[in-house]
């Protein structure tokens, strides 16, 4: 913990070690889902191949998720390195759908996003329809 005096204002900084994980299998995905449900929060952000969403070449590459400050995880989707990081048999569409059904469509989990309009377009493309509150 650090105290910083700037002019007449005193700021408190807490050094926080972050914990970030790449989800590699269904067991880890279930743990991520349990964390989101336990805290009641899921801050989600998609990364893509930067193609327009309605182009056939559009691909979501990663879904990053945080359930509390300092903790986060990436769900590998249609990324060129997905097979290097995930267990054999990883089906990113099924894993995305599972996360969507249990977290995004869960009324009791508050969704937090920076660009929800875009992220929700991706969700809808994969038949995930958010329920509850989104900030």
What kind of feature is each model-predicted range?
Residues 13-135:
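Conserved RNase H-like, two-metal-ion catalytic cores of nucleic-acid enzymes
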